Amino acid sequence: MFDRVEINIKAGDGGSGKVSFRREKFVPYGGPDGGDGGDGGNVYLEADSGLYSLLNFKHKRVHKASNGEGGMGSRCTGHNGADLVIKVPVGTVATILEENGQKRVLADLAADGDRTLVAHGGQGGLGNTHFVSSTNQAPMLAQKGQPGGEYDLILELKLIADVAIIGYPNVGKSSLLSLLTAAKPKVANYPFTTLSPVMGVIERPEGVFVMAEVPGLIENAHLGKGLGHDFLRHISRTRMVIHLLDGTSENPIDDMIKVNSELYLYDASLSERPQVVAINKIDDELVQLRREELKETFKEAGLEVFFISALTGEGVDVLLAKVAEKLDILKAADISETAPDHEVKIFRPAPKGKMGFRITRLEDGWQVEAPEIERIIEHSDIEDPEVRRQVMVLLKHRSVQQSLIKSGAVIGQKIITGRMEWYL
């Protein structure tokens, strides 16, 4: 199963505003009529029950929404970019990789139709109609569209099943699953026969439930040994666990303790999953001889144990009856929870500070970071004296010059704003 992938998502950039003038007698330049740019498309993740793995992402890492169109004359706004909906299997967890290297879960798509907005499209830039003032009746300024959000995501598929069969490698998990369901896991007499989770459906008079075999766990699985990380995360989405032990093992209860320790060390909540303990290979003569001894040992530990044979089916019905009983209790508790309403969840990036401008001292002058004005500079011909004059008026209007002087700048010093150099 292809169940973990890193992808890059990019929302659409906003379209740039338009500098244009209508033809009208006695109005300078015919009067401004530049339209705004369209907004860039958003990126969504949506759970789809028709998908079963993340294989679609193996050869396509970058996913982009459409950009917004630029503004047009006659005050016409550009078309918004088309949204991008990325379909993922139910049970997918999306984690964002922050710039500081930290990881943050932003979406857990646990039900069919769950949708999360993970990247906002950039806002369209303003056309020159927005820059009209009493002193500037013919603005030659327009704004570049904002860039869309761009993030690196980790998508992890955690299987969703009612029951997980766990245990050491080669204890008979695959044999038990194939006996109970139509699933056909690989069965052989060597460790790690199963390298990915296998699910099957069990139909009983008490009801239908889904059972999954989680590949064998070994010591230090919580550190990733033996593909431990890949296996352990699947247990977190199951209601309960069948802990299968090998009756021919020298110390089955010690095996159980070691596996449970790995669950706890990986995620303490996993060790709290309800468990039914089953000892396999009761068809083996040695296990039959040890049966009462093993039963007493587990009883002293406060555990009820079921003896089964995944080969002959002995004891399996009794085990399943107990599992079904526990599941009924767990499912009844779930009924009180609110059903998913498929409301679109929205991921909002952490704010990067207040809008406005920031002044920084440089070796040979000063830098003014003003995102809104920089977008105008980026989209304007600053070599044109009239355009440059209008930008300077904006800088003055936003109190940038006064703030520079208060910060220690003196007349004649070089100032950098975006790609424009100017002097105080």
Swiss-Prot record:
<dbReference type="InterPro" id="IPR036346">
    <property type="entry name" value="GTP-bd_prot_GTP1/OBG_C_sf"/>
</dbReference>
<keyword id="KW-0378">Hydrolase</keyword>
<protein>
    <recommendedName>
        <fullName>GTPase Obg</fullName>
        <ecNumber>3.6.5.-</ecNumber>
    </recommendedName>
</protein>
<dbReference type="InterPro" id="IPR027417">
    <property type="entry name" value="P-loop_NTPase"/>
</dbReference>
<feature type="binding site">
    <location>
        <position position="194"/>
    </location>
    <ligand>
        <name>Mg(2+)</name>
    </ligand>
</feature>
<dbReference type="InterPro" id="IPR014100">
    <property type="entry name" value="GTP-bd_Obg/CgtA"/>
</dbReference>
<feature type="domain" description="Obg">
    <location>
        <begin position="1"/>
        <end position="160"/>
    </location>
</feature>
<keyword id="KW-0963">Cytoplasm</keyword>
<feature type="binding site">
    <location>
        <begin position="213"/>
        <end position="216"/>
    </location>
    <ligand>
        <name>GTP</name>
    </ligand>
</feature>
<dbReference type="GO" id="GO:0042254">
    <property type="term" value="P:ribosome biogenesis"/>
</dbReference>
<feature type="binding site">
    <location>
        <begin position="309"/>
        <end position="311"/>
    </location>
    <ligand>
        <name>GTP</name>
    </ligand>
</feature>
<feature type="domain" description="OBG-type G">
    <location>
        <begin position="161"/>
        <end position="328"/>
    </location>
</feature>
<comment type="similarity">
    <text>Belongs to the TRAFAC class OBG-HflX-like GTPase superfamily. OBG GTPase family.</text>
</comment>
<dbReference type="GO" id="GO:0003924">
    <property type="term" value="F:GTPase activity"/>
</dbReference>
<dbReference type="Pfam" id="PF09269">
    <property type="entry name" value="DUF1967"/>
</dbReference>
<feature type="binding site">
    <location>
        <begin position="167"/>
        <end position="174"/>
    </location>
    <ligand>
        <name>GTP</name>
    </ligand>
</feature>
<feature type="domain" description="OCT">
    <location>
        <begin position="349"/>
        <end position="424"/>
    </location>
</feature>
<comment type="function">
    <text>An essential GTPase which binds GTP, GDP and possibly (p)ppGpp with moderate affinity, with high nucleotide exchange rates and a fairly low GTP hydrolysis rate. Plays a role in control of the cell cycle, stress response, ribosome biogenesis and in those bacteria that undergo differentiation, in morphogenesis control.</text>
</comment>
<keyword id="KW-0547">Nucleotide-binding</keyword>
<dbReference type="GO" id="GO:0000287">
    <property type="term" value="F:magnesium ion binding"/>
</dbReference>
<feature type="binding site">
    <location>
        <position position="174"/>
    </location>
    <ligand>
        <name>Mg(2+)</name>
    </ligand>
</feature>
<dbReference type="InterPro" id="IPR045086">
    <property type="entry name" value="OBG_GTPase"/>
</dbReference>
<dbReference type="Pfam" id="PF01926">
    <property type="entry name" value="MMR_HSR1"/>
</dbReference>
<dbReference type="GO" id="GO:0005737">
    <property type="term" value="C:cytoplasm"/>
</dbReference>
<feature type="binding site">
    <location>
        <begin position="192"/>
        <end position="196"/>
    </location>
    <ligand>
        <name>GTP</name>
    </ligand>
</feature>
<dbReference type="GO" id="GO:0005525">
    <property type="term" value="F:GTP binding"/>
</dbReference>
<dbReference type="Pfam" id="PF01018">
    <property type="entry name" value="GTP1_OBG"/>
</dbReference>
<keyword id="KW-0460">Magnesium</keyword>
<dbReference type="InterPro" id="IPR006169">
    <property type="entry name" value="GTP1_OBG_dom"/>
</dbReference>
<feature type="binding site">
    <location>
        <begin position="280"/>
        <end position="283"/>
    </location>
    <ligand>
        <name>GTP</name>
    </ligand>
</feature>
<dbReference type="InterPro" id="IPR036726">
    <property type="entry name" value="GTP1_OBG_dom_sf"/>
</dbReference>
<dbReference type="InterPro" id="IPR031167">
    <property type="entry name" value="G_OBG"/>
</dbReference>
<keyword id="KW-0479">Metal-binding</keyword>
<keyword id="KW-0342">GTP-binding</keyword>
<dbReference type="InterPro" id="IPR015349">
    <property type="entry name" value="OCT_dom"/>
</dbReference>
<comment type="subunit">
    <text>Monomer.</text>
</comment>
<dbReference type="InterPro" id="IPR006073">
    <property type="entry name" value="GTP-bd"/>
</dbReference>
